[in-house]
Amino acid sequence: MTMAARLMLVAALLCAAAAAATAQQATNVRATYHYYRPAQNNWDLGAPAVSAYCATWDASKPLSWRSKYGWTAFCGPAGAHGQAACGKCLRVTNPATGAQITARIVDQCANGGLDLDWDTVFTKIDTNGIGYQQGHLNVNYQFVDCRD
């Protein structure tokens, strides 16, 4: 392979990596809230009151893993969906206030965005109360390393 061909290959790989990184975030995404009540349900993804989609794969994870971050359902416009999303983490930002939090994907949804746990995520970034008043927030999210 010539040097020019190698440089073109490296450039193509860098572009692909940049595109993949960009695809792992979204802005102005609708985020509703859901009452998973993880603390009241012993952080049990399979509890009848929770019944999270990801319980099939993640319910047997250690309590320290299940309780490390607040919970969210994910059906956003960018990133993996279904089983491939289970257990991944999102950095969720309320651009209106700058409040941020890391949340773990434990469920799927159908609203085209996020369905944040009320106790562990939504109220933590709805610092001005507008999300509660409107019934939703518009947020930005980015997939991040959970550091598990």
UniProtKB/Swiss-Prot annotation:
Pfam families found in the cross-reference section: Barwin
Coiled coil regions in record: none
All copies of domain Barwin, residue ranges: 24-148
InterPro entries to which the protein is assigned, alphabetical: Barwin_CS (IPR018226), Barwin_dom (IPR001153), PR4 (IPR044301), RlpA-like_sf (IPR036908)
Cleaved signal peptide residues: 1-23
Keywords of the record: Antimicrobial, Disulfide bond, Fungicide, Hypersensitive response, Pathogenesis-related protein, Plant defense, Pyrrolidone carboxylic acid, Signal
Biological process, per Gene Ontology: defense response to bacterium; defense response to fungus; killing of cells of another organism; plant-type hypersensitive response
GO MF terms, alphabetically ordered: RNA nuclease activity
Function of the molecule: Shows antifungal activity towards B.cinerea and towards the wheat-specific pathogenic fungi F.culmorum and F.graminearum (groups 1 and 2).
Keyword Cell cycle tagged: no
Superkingdom assignment: Eukaryota
Disulfide bonds: 54-86, 75-109, 89-146
Alphabetized CDD domains for the sequence: DPBB_barwin-like
Quaternary data: Monomer.
Name by which UniProt lists this protein: Wheatwin-2
Gene responsible for this protein: PR4B
Modified residues (Pyrrolidone carboxylic acid): 24
